[in-house]
């Protein structure tokens, strides 16, 4: 029996095509994935992300615990509401999950983790928290709606209370705050401006309907995937997992090496991997016809004239650009050109940093 979010019936009302997503009944699309994608790039769209796991970490050791648990450093967070992105690593520096952590106070942090990794994450967090004076509280009674796109904030403003609107006025990216019953964050998974709104389950249907009434288009998992890939954002389980370290997943920027005496889980293994050199995650662009897909082999010749091989982790047709894009894990010596094997022949692709579209425009 699949889990259903509190918005399940709202999806059916909008004629969603429902699919199983890691044990959850979720909307794939509401008729046209392409239209939903363009709505987010050009106007405003919304996603039910209530399957995500919200965890509150509280107690006198909350800060010290998260400094041990995460490769990024929550000590960087000094302004209430500020958030950071990073990886939770195992002892071998494999990525258990990627997550966002909000700093609410020195004794209260909010962590949002992926749904597919929920049980594994909660077990790991519980185990690692044992020596610390902290309380780990999962918040299943909270739903979450992401409102994304160039007009998302303006449309959300029409459903917020005056108090909520003044609270979010001028809020910078990667912040979150509680106002009334809503936790409103300037985060997202699309490369557009907008909010991720955590809402009590009993209020979620009304909020969804109010956003629908202001012309925010409901969007499914299909558009969510093409949008995040255009933005060069990783999907856990495809672009990285426990067999991959963050340096090989374009997450090097999320590792806080300083201060050097912060002994986060996985640090020793990661230091060794960094010294050895690792593979890297790059972006691929193919302007010829065809679609780059997960697991297709990638070939290039290194500076010594030796052929090297990698593979595509995520690939799709980019509705914004009009051709195919992908992320690929490859040996570090790759240049600006490579080849992908598709339909038994090799096709030339451009190699770029993995960011294709930001704020509606080509990013490379």
UniProtKB/Swiss-Prot annotation:
<dbReference type="Pfam" id="PF01571">
    <property type="entry name" value="GCV_T"/>
</dbReference>
<dbReference type="GO" id="GO:0008483">
    <property type="term" value="F:transaminase activity"/>
</dbReference>
<dbReference type="Pfam" id="PF08669">
    <property type="entry name" value="GCV_T_C"/>
</dbReference>
<dbReference type="InterPro" id="IPR027266">
    <property type="entry name" value="TrmE/GcvT_dom1"/>
</dbReference>
<comment type="similarity">
    <text>Belongs to the GcvT family.</text>
</comment>
<comment type="subunit">
    <text>The glycine cleavage system is composed of four proteins: P, T, L and H.</text>
</comment>
<dbReference type="InterPro" id="IPR028896">
    <property type="entry name" value="GcvT/YgfZ/DmdA"/>
</dbReference>
<dbReference type="InterPro" id="IPR006222">
    <property type="entry name" value="GCV_T_N"/>
</dbReference>
<dbReference type="GO" id="GO:0004047">
    <property type="term" value="F:aminomethyltransferase activity"/>
</dbReference>
<dbReference type="GO" id="GO:0005829">
    <property type="term" value="C:cytosol"/>
</dbReference>
<dbReference type="GO" id="GO:0005960">
    <property type="term" value="C:glycine cleavage complex"/>
</dbReference>
<dbReference type="InterPro" id="IPR013977">
    <property type="entry name" value="GCST_C"/>
</dbReference>
<dbReference type="GO" id="GO:0019464">
    <property type="term" value="P:glycine decarboxylation via glycine cleavage system"/>
</dbReference>
<dbReference type="InterPro" id="IPR006223">
    <property type="entry name" value="GCS_T"/>
</dbReference>
<protein>
    <recommendedName>
        <fullName>Aminomethyltransferase</fullName>
        <ecNumber>2.1.2.10</ecNumber>
    </recommendedName>
</protein>
<dbReference type="InterPro" id="IPR022903">
    <property type="entry name" value="GCS_T_bac"/>
</dbReference>
<dbReference type="InterPro" id="IPR029043">
    <property type="entry name" value="GcvT/YgfZ_C"/>
</dbReference>
<keyword id="KW-0808">Transferase</keyword>
<comment type="function">
    <text>The glycine cleavage system catalyzes the degradation of glycine.</text>
</comment>
<keyword id="KW-0032">Aminotransferase</keyword>
């Amino acid at each position: 029996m699949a889990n259903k979010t509190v918005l399940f019936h709202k999806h059916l009302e909008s004629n969603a095509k429902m699919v199983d997503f890691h044990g959850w009944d979720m909307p794939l699309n509401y008729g046209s994935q392409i239209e939903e994608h363009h709505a987010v790039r050009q106007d405003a769209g919304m996603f039910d992300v209530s399957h995500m796991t919200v965890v509150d970490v509280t107690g006198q050791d909350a800060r010290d615990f998260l400094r041990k648990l995460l490769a990024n450093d929550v000590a960087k967070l000094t302004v209430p509401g500020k958030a950071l992105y990073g990886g939770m690593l195992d002892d071998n520096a494999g990525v258990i999950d990627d997550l966002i952590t909000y700093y609410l106070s020195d004794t209260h942090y909010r962590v949002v983790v992926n749904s597919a990794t929920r049980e594994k994450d909660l077990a790991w967090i519980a185990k690692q928290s044992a020596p610390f004076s902290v309380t780990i509280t999962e918040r299943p009674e909270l739903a979450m709606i992401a409102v994304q796109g160039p007009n998302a904030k303006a449309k959300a403003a029409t459903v917020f209370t005056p108090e909520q609107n003044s609270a979010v006025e001028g809020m910078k990216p990667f912040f979150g705050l509680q106002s009334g019953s809503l936790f409103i964050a300037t985060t997202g998974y699309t490369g557009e401006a907008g909010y991720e709104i955590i809402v009590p389950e009993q209020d979620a249907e009304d909020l969804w309907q109010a956003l629908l009434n202001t012309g925010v288009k409901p969007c499914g998992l299909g558009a969510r995937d093409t949008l995040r890939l255009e933005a060069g954002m990783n999907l856990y389980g495809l672009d990285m997992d426990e067999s991959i370290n963050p340096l090989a997943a374009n997450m090097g920027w999320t590792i806080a090496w300083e201060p050097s005496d912060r002994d986060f889980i996985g640090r020793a293994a990661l230091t060794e991997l960094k010294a050895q050199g690792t593979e890297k995650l790059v972006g691929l662009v193919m302007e010829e016809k065809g679609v780059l897909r997960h697991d297709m082999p990638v070939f290039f010749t290194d500076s010594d004239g030796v052929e090297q091989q990698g593979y595509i982790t995520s690939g799709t047709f980019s509705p914004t650009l009009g051709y195919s894009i992908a992320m690929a894990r490859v040996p570090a010596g790759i240049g600006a050109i490579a080849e992908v094997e598709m339909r038994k022949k090799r096709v030339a692709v451009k190699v770029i940093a993995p960011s294709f579209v930001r704020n509606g425009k080509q990013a490379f």
